[in-house]
């Protein structure tokens, strides 16, 4: 079971949060890994899912971070080794040029606020679980819905156990933010 499946199962079974897990692959072009257009390729399908399911309140784009082989993004939560996570936000702007007009995003503030709520909730209950909120110029399809989270969960250097433990903490944190 992949981590998206596991997170979806935790949210629905343990917390009663109805989920839909989309497993589209958008970074393989003609059988070769190419991430340069992944968000552009995903956008129409994600838009359709949101249009067909207007009750969706939260969108989570779950990734593993790519780090140097010697880097291990792990902390201990409740005595268990747990992969750390990082919230990633697209601002549709650059420091040098300001707003990127062709990358409109009406939900920048909503998504930043949601990331910050998640970060604070996790820091209060699970110190060390989150890394930082990472800000970049692109929008990463975060313009499609308020309460969109792009999450870098662990990295390729984390074990399955560490990742599963992280999904448990992430699910609990999401439940805390959404219901409290």
Language model segments and positions:
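N-terminal catalytic or cofactor-binding beta/alpha core of small enzyme domains
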Residues: 1-57, 65-75, 168, 178-179
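Soluble non-cytosolic domains of exported or imported proteins
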Residues: 1-2, 33-40, 105-113, 157-165
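Loop/turn elements at helix/coil->beta-strand transitions in domains of secreted/extracellular proteins
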Residues: 15-18, 54-58, 82-84, 128-129, ...
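Structural recognition of the beta-strand scaffold that forms the well-ordered cores
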Residues: 19-21, 58-61, 86-88, 132, ...
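Solvent-exposed loop/turn segments at secondary-structure junctions
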Residues: 25-29, 64-69, 91-95, 138-141, ...
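A short, glycine/acidic-enriched catalytic loop
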Residues: 68-104
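Active-site-adjacent substrate-binding region
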Residues: 107-134
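Active-site-adjacent mobile loop/cap segments within catalytic or ligand-binding domains
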Residues: 129-180
């Amino acid at each position: 079971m992949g981590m998206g499946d596991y997170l979806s199962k935790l949210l629905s079974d343990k917390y009663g949060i109805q989920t839909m897990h989309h497993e589209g692959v958008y970074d393989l072009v003609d059988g070769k890994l190419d991430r340069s257009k992944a968000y552009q390729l995903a956008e129409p399908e994600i838009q359709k899912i949101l249009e067909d399911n207007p009750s969706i309140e939260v969108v989570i784009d779950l990734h593993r971070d790519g780090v140097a082989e010697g880097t291990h993004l792990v902390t201990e939560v409740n005595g268990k080794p747990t992969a750390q996570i990082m919230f990633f936000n697209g601002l549709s702007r650059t420091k040098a040029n300001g707003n990127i007009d062709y990358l409109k995003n009406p939900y920048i503030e909503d998504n930043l606020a949601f990331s910050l709520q998640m970060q604070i909730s996790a820091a209060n209950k699970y110190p060390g679980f989150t890394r930082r909120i990472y800000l970049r110029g692109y929008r990463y399809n975060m313009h499609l819905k308020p309460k969109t989270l792009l999450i870098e969960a662990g990295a390729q250097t984390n074990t399955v156990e560490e990742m599963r433990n992280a999904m448990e903490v992430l699910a609990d944190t999401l439940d805390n933010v959404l219901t409290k």
